[in-house]
């Protein structure tokens, strides 16, 4: 009900009805009042005219009695005529009740003294009570000199007339006026409702459009063909709606691009408002915050507070869960609505860069050590031979053998470095052939039989001699040589090294398993990285360059396969090679 009363249509309709009703009431009151006044005045004028004629007739006549009788025939109500010579000496015995009351009014009302004393015409409304009802009469006193007396200058011609006819006429006019007003009001009501509905129809359309715009629907654009202010308003609103749609689309596009860029960033991004609440974050930041420890959280909060205080960009290093991050916090004047300031936090994972830098340092140290050792041996033994320190043929032969071994070792080291450089520049070429896997594993068995016996290792091969794989013999020889050499370094006498074949629906699988020292969990994710080397204190024998497993991974991936490692510290390590089956 209240919503209907709040409608513009109802308000406009009620306003028009109220105005028209007020005007009709005022006009009706004015008309009725005027008609009452008009008929009263007309009646008074008519009575006055009758009184004047009677006064003139009586004054000019010699026979007063005949003149009075004749005068009674001239007026509408002959019984309403009274000619009073002296109002103080009038007998009321033969008068009717009405005339008695009229005579009493003349005698007792001081206004009528002006008729006798000043010769003025006086009119008064007199209410007569008769038979339990009241009736209003108009009583007019008109001066005349028809009969002289010693008490006053003038006599008086008094005529009274019943106003019931005027009241009936006024009542009829009132009823007609009210009926006319009601009819006019009814017509006005219908017309006003139609007019207000028609006028407000464009406004209702604009309201519907505004509601849809507030809900994000900009497609609805009402057509208002009028040329008035409402039509102009509709055109302006349609134009505004179109511009809002364009701006919203632009903002939405910008937001989508921004969100896509932020979510695609490798850095974690956080938006912090003045209340220290996160109002913006990407996936990387969510992952970091899910795994953050209390110390790192306290570190981050301190840096955010420092940025709020200094309003300057802060950049600090953070180490958490064996990973390394660079945290950058920047102060922003307006980060959300209302002009509130905030801080944007950028967390960049620098673990790979840190590890790569560390690996480069280790690589330089290892390569320097690896190069220095054979070079020192080559120099020492050759100087011994050249200087004649070693003269016995057997000693010379032994020294030359050592020189040869160190030369081969130096050559192998240089070849590994050259292979990596060549693979980076030209890529790795693999010539796969469908051939028995036994050909490769038999070769490995012969190659490492003596080494296993010398090291006290139990090396076993378990494979199906008839099974054929698709692989490059030389490249896979390089892979297995590296893996078995690594297994030999991380084992002790009595440990086992097992090479086993298996398969699934789409892949051939090769396991190289040892029961050696194993690899710590923090190293597992990096063993295939370039230049990476596990703790040298747990290895036995000569050290490599940290390129072997990196080269193995490149070879296996070039075959279209994968290589993985599983290890448990103190229990051993298993390398798993998967190659696609021959088509």
Curated annotation (Swiss-Prot):
It catalyses: ATP + protein L-histidine = ADP + protein N-phospho-L-histidine. Residues 33-174 are extracellular. One of its GO terms (molecular function) is phosphorelay sensor kinase activity. SMART domains: HAMP, HATPase_c, HisKA. Disruption phenotype: Inactivation significantly enhances staphylococcal nitric oxide susceptibility. Keywords: ATP-binding, Cell membrane, Kinase, Membrane, Nucleotide-binding, Phosphoprotein, Transferase, Transmembrane, Transmembrane helix, Two-component regulatory system. This is Sensor protein SrrB. It comes from Staphylococcus aureus (strain COL). The gene is srrB.
């Amino acid at each position: 009900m209240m919503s209907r009363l709040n409608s513009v249509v109802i308000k406009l309709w009620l306003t028009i009805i109220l105005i028209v009703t007020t005007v009709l009431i005022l006009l009706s009151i004015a008309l009725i009042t005027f008609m009452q006044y008009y008929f009263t005045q007309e009646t008074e004028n008519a009575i006055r005219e009758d009184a004047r004629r009677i006064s003139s007739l009586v004054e000019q006549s010699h026979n007063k009695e005949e003149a009075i009788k004749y005068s009674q025939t001239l007026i509408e109500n002959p019984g309403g005529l009274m000619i009073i010579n002296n109002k103080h000496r009038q007998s009321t015995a033969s008068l009717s009740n009405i005339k008695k009351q009229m005579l009493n009014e003349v005698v007792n009302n001081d206004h009528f003294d002006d008729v006798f004393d000043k010769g003025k015409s006086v009119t008064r409304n007199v209410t007569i009570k008769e038979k339990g009802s009241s009736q209003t009469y108009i009583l007019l006193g008109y001066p005349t000199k028809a009969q002289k007396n010693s008490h006053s200058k003038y006599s008086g011609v008094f005529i009274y007339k019943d106003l019931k006819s005027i009241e009936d006429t006024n009542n009829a006019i009132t009823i007609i006026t009210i009926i006319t007003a009601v009819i006019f009001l009814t017509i006005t009501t219908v017309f006003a409702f139609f007019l207000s509905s028609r006028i407000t129809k464009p406004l209702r359309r604009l309201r519907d459009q505004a509601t849809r715009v507030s809900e994000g629907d900009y497609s609805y654009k009402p057509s208002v063909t009028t040329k008035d202010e409402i039509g102009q308003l509709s055109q302006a609103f349609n134009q505004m709606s179109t511009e809002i749609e364009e701006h919203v689309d632009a903002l939405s596009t910008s937001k989508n691009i921004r969100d896509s860029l932020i979510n695609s960033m490798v850095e974690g991004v956080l938006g912090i408002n003045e209340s220290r609440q996160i109002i913006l974050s990407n996936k990387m930041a969510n992952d970091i915050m899910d795994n953050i420890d209390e110390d790192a959280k306290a570190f981050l909060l301190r840096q955010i507070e420092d940025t709020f205080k200094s309003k300057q960009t802060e950049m600090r290093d953070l180490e958490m869960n064996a990973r390394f991050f660079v945290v950058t916090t920047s102060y922003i004047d307006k980060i959300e609505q209302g002009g509130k300031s905030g801080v944007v936090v950028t967390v960049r994972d620098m673990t790979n860069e840190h590890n790569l830098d560390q690996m480069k340092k280790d690589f330089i140290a290892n390569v320097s050590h690896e190069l220095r050792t054979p070079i020192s041996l080559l120099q020492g033994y050759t100087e011994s031979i050249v200087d004649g320190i070693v003269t016995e043929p057997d000693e010379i032969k032994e020294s030359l053998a050592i020189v040869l071994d160190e030369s081969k070792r130096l050559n192998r080291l240089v070849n590994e470095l050259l292979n990596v450089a060549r693979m980076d520049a030209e890529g790795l070429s693999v010539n796969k052939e469908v051939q028995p896997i036994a050909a490769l594993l038999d070769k490995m068995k012969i190659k490492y039989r003596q080494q296993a016996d010398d090291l006290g290792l139990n090396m076993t091969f378990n494979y199906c001699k008839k099974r054929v794989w698709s692989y490059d013999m030389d490249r896979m020889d390089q892979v297995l040589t590296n893996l078995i050499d690594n297994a030999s370094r991380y084992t002790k006498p009595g440990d086992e090294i097992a090479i086993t074949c298996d398969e699934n629906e789409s892949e051939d699988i090769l396991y190289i398993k040892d029961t050696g020292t194993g690899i710590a969990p923090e190293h597992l994710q990096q063993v295939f990285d370039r230049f990476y080397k596990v703790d040298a204190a747990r290895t036995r024998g000569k050290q490599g360059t940290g390129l072997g497993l990196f080269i193995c991974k490149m070879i296996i991936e070039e075959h279209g396969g994968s290589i993985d490692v599983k290890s448990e510290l103190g229990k051993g390590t298993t390398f798993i090679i998967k190659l696609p089956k021959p088509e």
